[in-house]
Amino acid sequence: MAPRLEFKLTPPPGPHPGIGVIGAGFIVADCHLPAYKHAGFTVNSLWSRDQTKAKAVASRHGIGTVHSDWRQLLDDKQVRVVDVAVPPNAQPEVILEACTRPHIQGILAQKPLAMDPATASILVTACEKAGKVLVVNQNMRHDQAVRSCSNLIRSGWLGKPVLATIDLRAIPHWMPWSEGLRSLTTYILSVHHLDTFRAWLGTPDRVMASTRTDPRTNFPHTDGINIYILEYDQGPRALGIDDVWTAPLKPSSPMDTTCPGNQSVRFRVEGTLGWAEGTIGWPSWPARQPSTLDFASRSDPGTIHRPRWREVWFPDAFAGPMSELLWQLRGGPEAELCGRDNLQTIALCEAVLQSGKSRQTAIVSDYMPQN
């Protein structure tokens, strides 16, 4: 018999503290807020630099207050938890400011927490000193197939992990703010897969990365296509391929009808007792396409298990990180996605970035802040 798969985290019971959201882009409007509403969370205020957009999003989701300034939202005593949904280069200022508000108990930051390990460490330390619960919205860990695969690994169903792979051939929802950052694919997209490998196997010891600019996009960047190998002293290996402007689709136009495209994200984990493999459904967004998982083990000879669910990563999995934060505020366990843990994901991103630049193996611990 297969182990029980907890493919989603149960939200804590209400009443819930008031949530204020800073930002009103598509990921907030179409993922954060629908997921929070379905989970029964209380979002009572919103801010966006584009006030027209903020008012439209608030009206759509029944949010009563639209603030004219993000600092005004932080001053709102009805806000106990802040969902910071701004670009990564703007996020540190907001988090540090939130640390100065005594009534704010929790902060949900977006991934990447920061664009370099040193800044990320400053934010984590500031939240700890201020007594704020900091959780990073690495929501791929709450994708239903990814989370179920984590269950299989932790239960020992697959035996000792041997090899894990993630192969992405898809175009993410690139935002204009991603242009001009010190890293493109590594910190904005690969961060999802690197964090998932950490959830499955732990933090690796070494990284070998190959990266190149992608001729299919139209703005300057350094890390376009990423290929990386993660090495663990205890034995496992992981391989990631992030082809983020996959041919033949054009990055800023409809599908090229002269050569139909085929976007996909596939993963596989092999252990000494079994295997698990599946697909990630987000490339079909806005259509609801659940991720899939198939697995087998010597513990259940002759059977391939194929659990399925109706939930999808976009938007349903977005309730997971906020649930972790709210459970911790209620006295539950420390969030798996806590800021301190995320420093290892940021260090891993930096190791991949530097390995790709130097064409040499990078030691992940070299990029961990020493505090």
PLM region descriptions:
Residues 1-15, 81-83, 324-371:
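C-terminal helix-rich "cap/oligomerization" subdomain common to oxidoreductases
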Residues 2-61:
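N-terminal Rossmann-like dinucleotide-binding module
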Residues 2-5, 188-285, 319-333, 350, ...:
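Contiguous beta-strand/loop segments that form the cofactor/metal-binding neighborhood of enzyme cores
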Residues 27, 49-50, 310-323, 340:
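Active-site loop of classical SDR/Rossmann-like NAD(P)-dependent oxidoreductases
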Residues 28, 67, 107-109, 134-136, ...:
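Hydrophobic residues in well-ordered beta-strands that form the structural core
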Residues 50, 61-126:
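Beta-loop-alpha module in the N-terminal Rossmann-like domain of NAD(P)-dependent dehydrogenases
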Residues 125-132, 147-161, 268-271:
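Basic phosphate/pyrophosphate-binding loop/patch that engages nucleotide-derived ligands
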Residues 140-228, 359:
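Predominantly a Rossmann-like dinucleotide-binding segment in NAD(P)-dependent oxidoreductases
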